[in-house]
Design a protein with these regions (language model features):
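Flexible, glycine-rich beta-alpha linker
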Residues: 1-14, 32
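A conserved pocket-lining segment of Rossmann-fold NAD(P)-dependent short-chain dehydrogenase/reductase
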Residues: 15-37
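Structural element of the ATP-grasp superfamily
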Residues: 17, 124-126
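Glycine-rich Rossmann NAD(P)(H)-binding loop
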Residues: 26-32, 60-67, 78-80, 112-113, ...
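A conserved structural motif in NAD(P)-dependent oxidoreductases
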Residues: 35-42, 138
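Short aromatic/basic micro-patch
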Residues: 36, 67, 119-120, 136
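Mid/C-terminal beta-alpha module of Rossmann-like enzyme folds, strongest
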Residues: 45-109, 122, 144-171
Length: 171
């Protein structure tokens, strides 16, 4: 499962959210458009392209056309998992994250990827697969669905005490 917010990944997002602490993000990204697709929709697109004569020798972007600013996406994370965000100066953000190995690529990821508006025209793949944009899971629904699944699958160690408490409560 991937949970991304600008250049941050799930390990940082969840650790901070569960601790009740904010994540720090670059102010420069707050109004930049991003496109994120739920993996289930991408797999449906793939399945409809395999052995599809209309897909031969073609290149496709497998994505939704739904897009939001990173600021809007941050609000989804707040609504779904309680994640708080503080927006700060970009150079200060990069200083906090570090720019030496293994993080030496963060500046480039931010400046040459995440700070560019990413709005996808998926009309070609929709036309070839016969799918409609309305069939896609919305970003907020996808994040919520995956967050709920993650919580169900999280392993917190042996959980012996929790199991004994559960057994006691069932008596």
């Amino acid at each position: 499962r991937r949970f991304q917010l600008v250049t941050l990944e799930a390990n940082t997002l969840f650790r901070r959210a569960f601790a009740g602490k904010p994540v720090i993000l670059p102010q420069a990204a707050v109004d930049v458009q991003g496109t994120m697709s739920w993996a289930g929709d991408v797999s449906r697109l793939m399945a409809k392209l395999v052995l599809n004569d209309g897909a031969r020798q073609e290149a496709f972007t497998l994505s939704t056309s739904e897009h939001h600013t990173w600021g809007e996406i941050a609000k989804y994370y707040e609504e779904i998992m309680g994640l708080k965000v503080e927006w700060i100066d970009t150079d200060a953000y990069l200083d906090i994250l570090g720019t030496s190995a293994p993080y030496s690529g963060l500046r480039y990821q931010l400046e040459y990827d995440r700070l560019f508006n990413r709005v996808v025209d998926n009309s070609k793949v929709l036309r070839v697969t016969g799918m409609k944009q309305e069939e896609f899971t919305t970003l907020k629904q996808g994040l919520s669905l995956e967050f709920d699944k993650l919580l169900e699958e999280l392993t917190w160690g042996s959980g012996d005490i929790a199991k004994r408490m559960e057994a006691f409560c069932r008596q």
